[in-house]
UniProtKB/Swiss-Prot annotation:
Species of origin: Duck hepatitis B virus (strain Germany/DHBV-3) (DHBV)
Gene Ontology molecular function: any one: metal ion binding
Protein name: Protein P
Pfam families linked: DNA_pol_viral_C, DNA_pol_viral_N, RVT_1
Biased composition (Low complexity): 288-298
Keywords recorded for this protein, A-Z: DNA replication, DNA-binding, DNA-directed DNA polymerase, Endonuclease, Hydrolase, Magnesium, Metal-binding, Multifunctional enzyme, Nuclease, Nucleotidyltransferase, RNA-directed DNA polymerase, Transferase
Record note on domains: Terminal protein domain (TP) is hepadnavirus-specific. Spacer domain is highly variable and separates the TP and RT domains. Polymerase/reverse-transcriptase domain (RT) and ribonuclease H domain (RH) are similar to retrovirus reverse transcriptase/RNase H. The polymerase/reverse transcriptase (RT) and ribonuclease H (RH) domains are structured in five subdomains: finger, palm, thumb, connection and RNase H. Within the palm subdomain, the 'primer grip' region is thought to be involved in the positioning of the primer terminus for accommodating the incoming nucleotide. The RH domain stabilizes the association of RT with primer-template.
Compositional bias segments (type: Polar residues): 207-221
Amino acid sequence: MPQPLKQSLDQSKWLREAEKQLRVLENLVDSNLEEEKLKPQLSMGEDVQSPGKGEPLHPNVRAPLSHVVRAVTTDLPRLGNKLPARHHLGKLSGLYQMKGCTFNPEWKVPDISDTHFDLEVINECPSRNWKYLTPAKFWPKSISYFPVQAGVKPKYPDNVMQHESIVGKYLTRLYEAGILYKRISKHLVTFKGQPYNWEQQHLVNQHQIPDGATSSKINGRQENRRRRTPIKSTCRQNDTKRDSDMVGQVSNNRSRIRPCANNGGDKHPPATGSLACWGRKASRVIKSGSSRDSSASVDSRRRSKGPRGFSTLPRRETTGNDHHSSDISNSVEATTRRRSTPGESITLGDSSIIPDGTSCASDKDSSPKEENVWYLRGNTSWPNRITGKLFLVDKNSRNTTEARLVVDFSQFSKGKNAMRFPRYWSPNLSTLRRILPVGMPRISLDLSQAFYHLPLNPASSSRLAVSDGQWVYYFRKAPMGVGLSPFLLHLFTTALGSEISRRFNVWTFTYMDDFLLCHPNARHLNSISHAVCSFLQELGIRINFDKTTPSPVTEIRFLGYQIDEHFMKIEESRWKELRTVIKKIKVGEWYDWKCIQRFVGHLNFVLPFTKGNIEMLKPMYAAITNQVNFSFSSAYRTLLYKLTMGVCKLRINPKSSVPLPRVATDATPTHGAISHITGGSAVFAFSKVRDIHIQELLMTCLARIMIKPRCLLSDSTFVCHKRYQTLPWHFAVLAKQLLKPIQLYFVPSKYNPADGPSRHRPPDWTAFPYTPLSKAIYIPHRLCGT
């Protein structure tokens, strides 16, 4: 293509070439969108281009990208209707056609440890974030409750009982780790682990549970304990006859009463009575002498917690079966001791039967006595219903031996109960490129069970109820299925990252449960990482050392990117998978919009590492927005494949150059002008009158094609913002592709040097104030110093 002389732009040959290019651009603009193939059709559209007989399976990508883009303008993809279409594109499938989960009867429940961070972290890591986290609150606008029997989703119809059994074991493991509350009655729950300060005021002694606080099913009939005729408590302590009558009544009624915590599930009939059902009567059997004797075995750790720490009664050795004692006196003894011991509760074992902590202590094979169980009467009622449903899947594609618990609290994010969760800063790729330090060794840390570090207010926990079909549990820590949890985790790790950066003088970046530490000295960074891990563990924050970098490295994988000392890139395996998917596109066939949605998600991730732009994906976005089928054309498939071939890596902390503008453009409804800083100018007449922003963009694109400047001056904000989605698609793609690599500066019309030539006056380059209109990238203050 002929290049103009810098002294003047009015070269005859150059002008003829420029006029030709302008007419091509005008033809693209004048194509009416209603007549194009991008409009949703009422029929399937038989004129869709079909692949030829000799067409190769892989697209031809030898042509330059600019030629491929121009070819798409004549061979457009199409939108269809909402009839059933293909929902498989290579290995991708529609979101509602996910690969069915396979049940594994040998699933193991992963090890879940107690994650209780010390509240001293508020003083060690001062931040305003802690007032939102100690405790976190969750207040949905409205709640839909479901029956307890629907607690486990029927994900595996052929293995319902086994599925529910493993879910029960999983919930038991979470309960034992202090992550769940377990429902005892309408106003009473139990939990394990160390209580928080806000829970201390609601802890209760078992002996203080008032009469009539619970209800239970008796012979299949729901009765209120308050309505039953209780034994009068006016008896004297020395009246042994009345005591023996009470013992007989308690033991005789034992076989008829089910545990009141068996919330609607008869799948695993209990072997003994519940604590909450037997507490009021069994506690009266205890002699005052034994109560005095029990005061000697006070747990020192609980005593230090304050006046609400409770003592445990010593067990007496008995003989007989731990779970099914037929001897009346033994059963009453066990019931009495169980009721009088505030540090014990009924939990689910492997067989969903009462564990060793509630049975006699004479069995040498039984587990040691549980001492970290607490009873809490919150300032709320604990519903015998659930708000979320559960099912199990493989932990990940590489680990199918362990199960992962999926909690469905989608009612809080969609439908009539949808909540607007708070927004928080999350770095995009451009921000990440600018905040990462160049040429520094790096170490990554990963939090273990990150969400389970976040405690919830007990009243909020009652809104997050789940069940295995037998017991009702409430999340004491933040669950992963609620949209509020990522926001809380962001606050949590941000507060920790700020203190780590300040205390250890190291560059720190946090995103969800990932920490990235950078320092110029690798040896110093290695020692810092050990100090940081010790600091976090002293505060009760657990580190996943399996996913933590053991020593400083120069290349690290973070947020899905491969990051070395100077560049960011994407793994080659990901490119190969995407090329394979594009090769399997069948030209002319209709694809379901859900399948296209998944495909666009993969393309969006790699698009910044290509020479393409987001406008190239707009036809697929149109299909997703209108929820209609989509058909690929041959040229469009070639364009997508061409994008994956031009792989590039992005430089970390790119140099921001501000070149001096040397070319300016301007337009009127009838004429356009290009002006050079050397004084040369060229004026063009448009073939028809159009909107002024279209004419301005035409002249800017023409200047880019004919002169190839590093930057351009324009008095159109529409042109400078580079948002062309309102234009016909094929012209928007070309304009975005042409103007993406260069900087556009805005100049007021009265100072635009090209304003004179467009109005048949000489250009004026003496004074022209200009500014870029691109929005500055937001970077947190603590990351701005790098």
